[in-house]
């Protein structure tokens, strides 16, 4: 597999009407890694942006690193390939560079993304992610995807996958929520010790939850010292931990700003101060799934 570019554009919560333009701006800026998922319901528009830049001759398909994710309602082995080809078709691609299991939990199959019972809790499927993984491996063998990985797996789940008998294709990354309020020190150290890279989603936190990470005084002070924005500090923080990072933006100015993180370095003290902000604050906790047998966040890490 090609090495995953360390910086990518996240497309989660990017409205279909604005994501095509965002992708085009990002490619012009220099982004080559795009993080997508069936769940985001905007892969079609992402694909339009990618295709436009290929047609213009700005990039070739082989210059790009495109990631998508298998949604929880498609964990049944017989559903994996059609889920993948659906994303490929939407993105207008012949292959994906990387395909991830979005969550370790299988949900009841069907058209509803979040099937819930009367009490509003997720309805599980009786699937096991080790079986789902075998269908993921088939996608690599068939050439539909170049590499496979996981997302939102805790270390016990990842260990179970890595120790699977007859594992044919290893997961290349574990994509997890990560920012200074949720530093994921133990999980990152575990993944890296097992040669599984880590990709950080929500690296800038999320003000929608009333958690204005970007306004944190410690981060602000470091930003002022370097003449950089708080967002640039948070992105650089992950890069210096050897963590791949996928900030989401549809704002052309911020798409550019988020990419300008290779011309400065955080000091050891900066890194220590940022790691010191950890408060185990998880923004993507998925509470309606917490009764699921494979819910990942009951384990310490």
Curated annotation (Swiss-Prot):
The residues annotated as the active site are 40 (proton donor)
- What's the catalysed reaction? 1,5-anhydro-D-glucitol + NADP(+) = 1,5-anhydro-D-fructose + NADPH + H(+)
Question: Which keywords accompany this UniProt record?
Answer: NADP, Oxidoreductase
Residues annotated to bind NADP(+):
35, 175, 246-258
Under Gene Ontology molecular function, one entry of this record is: 1,5-anhydro-D-fructose reductase activity
Show which residues form the site (Lowers pKa of active site Tyr).
69
Q: Indicate the temperature dependence noted in the record.
A: Optimum temperature is 37 degrees Celsius.
Root EC class: oxidoreductase
Q: How does it assemble?
A: Monomer.
Q: Which PANTHER family match?
A: ALDO/KETO REDUCTASE (PTHR11732)
- Annotated protein name in UniProt: 1,5-anhydro-D-fructose reductase
Give the originating organism.
Sus scrofa
């Amino acid at each position: 597999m090609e090495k995953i570019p360390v910086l990518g554009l996240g497309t989660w919560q990017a409205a279909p009407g604005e994501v095509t333009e965002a992708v085009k701006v990002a490619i012009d800026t220099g982004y080559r890694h795009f993080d997508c998922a069936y769940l985001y319901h905007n892969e079609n528009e992402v694909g339009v942006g990618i295709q436009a830049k290929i047609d213009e001759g700005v990039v070739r398909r082989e210059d790009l690193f495109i990631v998508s994710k298998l949604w929880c309602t498609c964990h049944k082995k017989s559903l994996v390939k059609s889920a993948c080809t659906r994303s490929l078709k939407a993105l207008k691609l012949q292959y994906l560079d990387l395909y991830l299991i979005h969550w370790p939990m299988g949900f009841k199959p069907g058209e509803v993304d979040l099937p819930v019972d009367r009490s509003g809790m997720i309805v599980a499927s009786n699937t096991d992610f080790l079986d789902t993984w075998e269908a993921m491996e088939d996608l690599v063998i068939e050439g539909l995807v170049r590499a496979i990985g996981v997302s939102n797996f805790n270390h016990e789940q990842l260990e179970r996958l890595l120790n699977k008998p007859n594992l044919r294709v290893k997961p290349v990354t574990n994509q997890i929520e990560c920012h200074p309020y949720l530093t994921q020190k133990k999980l990152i150290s575990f993944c890296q010790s097992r040669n599984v890279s880590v990709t950080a989603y929500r690296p800038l936190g999320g003000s929608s939850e009333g958690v204005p990470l970007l306004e944190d005084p410690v981060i602000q002070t470091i930003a002022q010292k370097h003449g950089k924005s708080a967002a640039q500090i948070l992105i650089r923080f992950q890069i210096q931990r050897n963590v791949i990072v996928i900030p989401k933006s549809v704002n052309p100015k911020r798409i550019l700003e988020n990419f300008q993180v290779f011309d400065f370095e955080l000091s050891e003290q900066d890194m220590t101060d940022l790691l010191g902000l950890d408060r185990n604050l998880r923004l993507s906790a998925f509470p309606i799934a917490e009764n699921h047998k494979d819910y990942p966040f009951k384990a310490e890490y």
